[in-house]
Every structure is written in structure tokens, then in C-alpha cells.
Amino acid sequence: MDAKTQAKYEARAKIIKSMAHPTRLFIVDELARTGERCVWELTEMVGVDMSTVSRHLAMLKNVGIIEDEKRGSQVYYSLRCRCATDFFECVESVMKCNAKDQQKLLAS
């Protein structure tokens, strides 16, 4: 693999890795559903402390999945690329395929 191809796959892996936590998946799903949320809203919804939610948001922002906008004393987060929800559809398809395979094994 040449350096350009390697860099492309490393960038992809970094983005996918940023989604590899249930809380971050929830945040992305919630932002896709509602359009935007501020930190305290997400903190209440997730049920963990604000610093933990802030770390999750920072990771998602760092790879370009979400963006923020400061309004007064609040910071609102939204999806930067709505195509992030396509990732969920792909994951759901894989889960369905896996479930079908598991059912076939159990039926054997």
C-alpha cells in the first residue's frame, strides 16, 4: 500500500473509531433526530457528568462529525455531515444479516 492510500485508510479509521462508543453513537443519533442540542441537554439525556459528555463531543468534533456554535453562555452542537446517519443504516444492515445467520445456525 502506498503512502497516499495508507493515509486515506488511517483517516477513515480515525473517523470510524470516533464512533466506537455507545454514548457517542447516541449523541450522533440524537443530533440527527433533533438538529442540535447543548451540552447540558445531552448530559441530562446520557446520564453522566458534563465533563464526560464534553470529552465525547470533543472527539466527534475533532474528526469533523459535529460542529458547535456558541450562543450566549451556551454551546450548541449539530451534525456537520448528515451522512453520518448512513453509517447507522449500514450498521443496522450488518446486525440484521448477523441475526439471520444466527437464526440459521440455531435452526440447523
Please annotate each region the language model reported.
Residues E44, K61-N62:
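Alpha-helical residues within the helix-turn-helix
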Residues V39, G64-I66, G72-S73, F88-C90:
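Short, Lys/Arg-enriched C-terminal cap helix and immediately downstream tail that follows
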Residues M1-A11, R33, R82-S108:
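Amphipathic alpha-helical dimerization/coiled-coil segments
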Residues D2, A7-S51, R71-R82:
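N-terminal helix-turn-helix DNA-binding core of bacterial DNA-binding proteins
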Residues L57-A58:
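Short, hydrophobic-biased segments on the C-terminal half of alpha helices
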